[in-house]
Amino acid sequence: MINQIDIKTRERMEACIQTFHNNISNIKTGRASPTLLHNIYIEYFGSKTPLRQVSNIIVEDSHTLKINVFDDSITSLIRKSILNSNLDLNPVLQGKDIIIPIPRLTEERRKQLIKVIRGDAESSRIQIRNIRRDANDKVKRLLKDKIISEDNEHTSQSKIQIMTNEYIKKIDCILEKKEKELMKF
């Protein structure tokens, strides 16, 4: 029973870390990356289709992305989708390809992004602590129902606390890495 609680807790904390990592990986650092366009969808044959399924996204250099479109008829749709996204990008048509220059970040914009990232990190830490609280409550219920002993309760809560510390450190490492990446340019 306690092992199931530990496993579920670890899975939930891992999902929280993954969500945090995905959220901040979409934040522009002034460097070209195909992941920047992973949330772009176009209307293709009546359904929303991810950009990466209808094209190849290539890093030309550190400040330029190139999109090789598989079907020339949707090039303008892709350009329009990128313009309508909130990424502040200005795609340029070049033959059947789309070139996207990635603007350099200003110092002010970097500081704003760092504040946003730190806010996301704090929200993720809070989620981790809430997951810990839920797990500890389940363990206390098991003790109350006399399914486990007090020793088992203390051992389990210690494991949960160690897990919590581990995942909060992971959040801090991801945050630190992203901050360095933002301040690099």
From Swiss-Prot:
SUPFAM superfamilies: Ribosome recycling factor, RRF. Its main location: cytoplasm. GO terms for biological process: cytoplasmic translational termination. GO terms for molecular function: ribosomal large subunit binding. It holds the Pfam family RRF. CDD domains: RRF. InterPro entries: Ribosome_recyc_fac (IPR002661), Ribosome_recyc_fac_dom (IPR023584), RRF_sf (IPR036191). It is found in: Cytoplasm. Keywords: Cytoplasm, Protein biosynthesis. Disulfide bonds: none annotated. Belongs to the RRF family. This is Ribosome-recycling factor. It comes from Buchnera aphidicola subsp. Acyrthosiphon pisum (strain 5A).
